[in-house]
Design a protein with these regions (language model features):
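Metallo-beta-lactamase
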Residues: 47-49, 143-238
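A structural signal for the main folded, soluble domain(s) of proteins
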Residues: 2-7, 47, 52, 63, ...
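Divalent metal-coordination and catalytic microenvironments
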Residues: 30, 44, 74, 86, ...
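Short Pro/Gly-enriched beta-strand edge/turn motifs at strand-loop
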Residues: 9-15, 115-119, 140-142
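Conserved beta-strand hairpin/beta-sheet module of binuclear metal-dependent hydrolase folds
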Residues: 4-63, 158-170, 175
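Active-site HxH/HxHxD metal-binding segment of metal-dependent hydrolases
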Residues: 47-52, 56-139
Length: 320
């Protein structure tokens, strides 16, 4: 865990960044400051299988303060999977999400919320209100601007504090790229939205970026350059993005499982809608089985996975 940036930009009083991994998004914790009526808050809560660790980290960081608010930059499972556990632990906590999916949360539509299409897990949680772009939210005594950041997710928001010029970028910008552009999987054009969001970030001129995954970074122009180059490659060859998306979905589930029998993995892939969509739209020249085998081979070749055999001789895929 990394609770402070490596750069020379100090975090504001009360703000702590808990750097997680790739299964769980980073948690940004804001302790209440003297006279802070809004109370303590956390932005993004990680994946469900890490809920116990998330609870312990937040409790330790707040040093006895009760958690008053949960804020989600978007509702992918790695950003809100800890919501339910936190709501159970802190019954009075209020939960705010980006606009666009309130009704889907209230009716718990797992297809619209992406949990069914991705084959990922997220326990049901309640919401209190919305993080409206163009407004501000007060965190540790400072007003953070809320900006719409569609692309990776059409409903995502990012937060910017103008005095410190710190940006919470979610999955709109990482030091070495950005998240899978999920609308594109379904054939919804969204690469232009990614580009527009990168332009928004550039205009904000942040001094320090807190990404959804990975460490904090200050060379924003370099990160934007990497992201735009990557985006240009995806626009020029959408097949590259489709292949990237499939491998990310597979690797992400392997992070959750850590090890899985190849037959069980095949069953999961065949039952997970996004793989069917990707295969049909981009990889139809191969059979589904051939395509899956190529995905596994790609993970093995990159060192992201290892193939072994269990006591019965059946092949097992291990996370690396």
């Amino acid at each position: 865990m990394n609770a402070s940036p490596a750069m020379h930009v100090p975090l504001p009083p009360g703000m702590t960044v808990l750097e997680r991994g790739w299964l769980s998004a980073n948690n940004i914790v804001f302790a209440a400051q003297p006279g802070d009526a809004e109370g303590a808050a956390v932005i993004d809560t990680g994946y469900v299988t890490h809920s116990a660790q998330t609870l312990a980290l937040i409790d330790s960081t707040l040093e006895g303060q009760p958690l008053a608010r949960i804020l989600n930059t978007h509702l992918h499972s790695d950003h809100c999977g800890g919501n339910a556990a936190l709501q159970q632990t802190y019954p009075q906590v209020q939960t705010f999400i980006a606009p666009g999916q309130a009704e889907q949360v209230r009716s718990w539509d797992e297809a619209a919320l992406s949990y069914a299409p991705t084959g990922q897990e997220c326990p049901r949680f309640a919401i209190t209100g919305l993080l409206q772009p163009g407004s501000t939210v007060r965190l540790s005594g400072r007003d953070w601007q809320i900006h719409a950041a569609p692309g990776h997710d059409p409903h995502s928001v990012i937060l910017f504090e103008p005095d410190s010029r710190i940006l919470i970028s979610a999955d709109a910008l990482w030091e070495n790229g950005f998240g899978v552009v999920f609308p594109e999987i379904e054939g919804i054009a969204a690469f232009d939205e990614v580009a527009a969001t990168l332009d928004v970030i550039e205009r904000l001129e942040p001094r320090l970026v807190v990404p959804g995954h990975g460490g904090l970074f200050g060379d924003v122009q370099a990160a934007l350059g990497i992201a735009r180059k990557r985006l240009a490659g995806f626009i020029q060859a959408p097949l590259r993005h489709a292949s990237y998306a499939a491998k990310v979905l597979l690797k992400y589930k392997l992070l959750e499982w850590q090890s899985i029998g190849v037959q069980e993995l095949q069953d999961w892939v065949h039952a997970t809608p996004y793989f069917g969509i990707l295969h049909q739209r981009y990889f139809g020249a191969q059979t589904a089985q051939q395509w899956l085998e190529s995905l596994i081979e790609s993970l093995l070749a990159s060192g992201a996975a290892e193939l072994r055999r269990d006591a019965t001789g059946a092949p097992v895929l291990l996370n690396q």
